[in-house]
Amino acid sequence: MAPLPLDDANMPLFTVGQVSEMLEVQQAFLRRLDEFRVVRPSRSAGGQRRYTRNEIVAVRYVVELMDDGLTLAAIRRVLELETKVRQLEAERDALRAELARLAAGA
């Protein structure tokens, strides 16, 4: 049986209104996050923003950072750096695995 779209955390299912209600934020705030390239939801065929569960988690994180006093520009940079760290950690892990494989074969 194929998984339901609700099982996919990356499936864009939720509208701006739904996310606004879930997180108790203004719809204008969500649009601003998109405009500032902080959280960029995909668009429906009709051009409406659609949020994934992962993007909703990201919006919640952004709200926490704003509550701590960060600006949207600073938050965007934090998110970029966190993404870069995850990429570098994955690369490091792949290199460690390759070294272990080479050492085992030596």
Describe each region flagged by the PLM.
Residues 2-12, 21, 35, 40-41, ...:
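Arg/Lys-rich, alpha-helical DNA-contact motif
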Residues 26-29:
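Short coil turns linking two alpha-helices in DNA-binding domains
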Residues 32:
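DNA-binding alpha-helical recognition surfaces that contact promoter or target DNA
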Residues 43-49:
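Short, Lys/Arg-rich nucleic-acid/phosphate-binding segment
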